Regions:
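Polytopic alpha-helical membrane proteins, predominantly small-molecule transporters/carriers
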Residues: 1-109
């Protein structure tokens, strides 16, 4: 169960780093840039821990799928980016796929 906790934290760090990309103003603002880099490094470090227990295909599908979903939702609320119905349908399919992929995985102990 700790493996999934690490995976969730890795996703949150990746999403935080991605949401900081526009704030860095093409890396011209040092503080947001440093925080963004630390978020990405933390996410990648945790992914290396998680793949010791879960198959990499499942880890990457979950990380990227939930990351895309989260960034799209946050982009809507924070940056006012649109979410037309085809995008909403696509996000629903991504989350459904993540749930399906994780339903049949057995962690290595």
């Amino acid at each position: 169960m700790i493996t999934y906790f690490f995976l969730i934290v890795a996703i949150l760090l990746e999403v935080a780093g991605t949401m900081l990309l526009p704030v860095t103003s093409s890396f011209s603002k040092p503080i947001p840039t440093i925080i963004m880099v630390l978020c990405y490094l933390g996410a990648l470090f945790l992914l290396t821990v998680v793949v010791k227990t879960l198959p990499i295909a499942v880890v990457y599908a979950t990380w990227s799928g939930l990351g895309v979903f989260s960034v799209a939702i946050l982009g809507y609320f924070i940056f006012g980016q649109g979410l037309p119905w085809p995008v909403i349908l696509g996000l629903f399919l991504i989350v459904s796929g993540v749930v399906l992929v994780n339903s049949f995985v057995e962690p290595k102990i």
